[in-house]
Amino acid sequence: METLLVVLHVFILFLLILGLFVMQKKHVSFSKRVFTALGLGIVFGFALQLIYGPTSNIVIQTADWFNIAGGGYVKLLQMVVMPLVFISILGAFTKLKLTKNLGKISGLIIGILVATTAVAAAVGIASALSFDLQAIQVDQGSTELSRGQELQQKSEDMTAKTLPQQIVELLPGNPFLDFTGARPTSTIAVVIFAAFLGVAFLGVKHKQPEQAETFKKLVDAVYAIVMRVVTLILRLTPYGVLAIMTKTIATSDLDSILKLGMFVIASYAALITMFIIHLLLLTFSGLNPVIYLKKAVPVLVFAFTSRSSAGALPLNIKTQRSMGVPEGIANFAGSFGLSIGQNGCAGIYPAMLAMMIAPTVGQNPFDPVFIITVIAVVAISSFGVAGVGGGATFAALLVLSSLNMPVALAGLLISIEPLIDMGRTALNVSGSMTSGLITSKVTKEIDQGAFHDQSRVIEAEEA
């Protein structure tokens, strides 16, 4: 009987996927299809949970089958992350028109990303203190304890090395190993390797322009192919979101989620506040935030539902281009934003965790010196955070271990991790685009006509 029910559930999922496919054939917008998938997944997941319970064999077996679509989609995103990061950084150098501004452009982008991460940390701290979040308020179940032990082990592996040794670890001793994502710092290592190749290209361009042009054509060709692969994966987003949301809701412990509801509310209050700050920064830079919102919605929706900053990179770059950002700057901002200064995952989240855990170690969370220390540590630790699932955890481990706090307590939030990760990812992408826009405005490279052309709104299929 159980097998028949599992088959029935898989058949229902197949019918829902078929419905989404029909919507695509009717040219329903990408954003609408993704939100439809999100809604269907939530309803279907709740139905399975209410009928059978999250721990029943039927739900567990059904979730296992659903994971072929959901987990497969995530694997495909992970597959393309390193090639995407590498070729985007390298492509940014080959597409850069004014090499004399290279230092200023890259410095501005990185500076804005890190500065906004520091602001995001302050917002996260304010939110945690306002909502009086404390780790001792949360009960530890077996899942939370298991997750805590896993994080503790990861932290011990990281803290076994001194700070100078950890800095050296950022460098790509073997770039081919880092292309496999084997190390926690693989993403930033690939960025550094690509940047070295890019700088070398600029040098060759002056001395041997013919060879540089050949290399540029090769990079442009690989860039086009990688972007095409990513576009094919992006088109699977509604189906992946449907399967992921159904599985997540069906297997979630609703009691734990309700108990942690205050943390979810506080997190989204901080995320929304930081997003408003992005809009204010654009306004102060002389850019219309309403136009930004209209053009940014598709990529922010994709980031929210996919929970992958890296997967959103092509759409991120195309969206910046539609707002008049030059191709080179758009590539730099999008690519650097994957591993440096993620406002959500590396800013708000670790800062809120630090405030929650502080009272458990006898630290007064309202101490100004402690607050400044947390902001500084968060900003510095924001280098090297990966743009695919797990980046926030890595950032939290770095921050908490640097502050000598028990990292195991971060495992308390495992039940709501997917829920808050959606908002964090959208904020990461917004921060990346904001840095590109402001940099373009400051360097006077922005195309104002393209920015104000509200007919240029990019959907995922166009990425």
Curated annotation (Swiss-Prot):
Q: Cellular component GO terms, alphabetically?
A: plasma membrane
Supply the InterPro entries for this chain. Na-dicarboxylate_symporter, Na:dicarbo_symporter_sf
A family per Pfam: SDF
Q: Topologically, how does it sit relative to the membrane?
A: Multi-pass membrane protein
> What molecular function does GO assign, one term?
L-cystine transmembrane transporter activity
* Regulation: induction: More strongly expressed in the presence of methionine than in presence of sulfate. Strongly inhibited by seleno-DL-cystine.
Main localization (coarse): membrane
Its keywords, alphabetically, are: Amino-acid transport, Cell membrane, Membrane, Transmembrane, Transmembrane helix, Transport
Protein's UniProt name: L-cystine uptake protein TcyP
**Protein task:** Mediates uptake of L-cystine, the oxidized form of L-cysteine. Although it is more specific for L-cystine, it could also transport a much broader range of amino acids and sulfur compounds including S-methylcysteine.
Compartments where found: Cell membrane
What superkingdom heads the lineage? Bacteria
**Regions crossing the membrane:** 3-23, 34-54, 73-93, 105-125, 184-204, 225-245, 262-282, 338-358, 369-389, 394-414
Tell me the SUPFAM superfamilies matching this sequence: Proton glutamate symport protein
Q: Which family does it belong to?
A: Belongs to the dicarboxylate/amino acid:cation symporter (DAACS) (TC 2.A.23) family.
